[in-house]
Amino acid sequence: MTEQEIYLGRYGWAVHVMSDVRPEDAAMVERRLRDLGCSGVPLEDAYSLVLEGKPNKGLTYSNVDTGKSVVVIGWAVCDAVYMNSLCHEMLHVVQHISEVFMVNMYGEEACYLLGGLVQSCYKVVKR
């Protein structure tokens, strides 16, 4: 597993990315989510998803009150599928930020935000 921290100064938002996650990382994922305020069924579901170890899975949890997100991207069968999962999960982050800051999801700001998040992960993706 690789971990990465992205800080979006314009929004005061921190995104913790956990990439190439496998079943042995389930406890660490659970701890990160719990620290963010995730609990109950969503936490149990996330833990189970990681523990299953199936390829091409991901999840995103955001605490909009604290301006923090955790993005978990499991192992993928190929780089193209990994990119798909990364973009999918980062779009959830954009949705959460957009909800708080009233960013138009049909406008350029949301598109640039998504592009910036994905670009920030380039070195991890390049692996």
Feature annotation, model-predicted:
Residues 29-33, 46, 121:
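Generic structural signal of hydrophobic/aromatic residues within well-ordered alpha-helices
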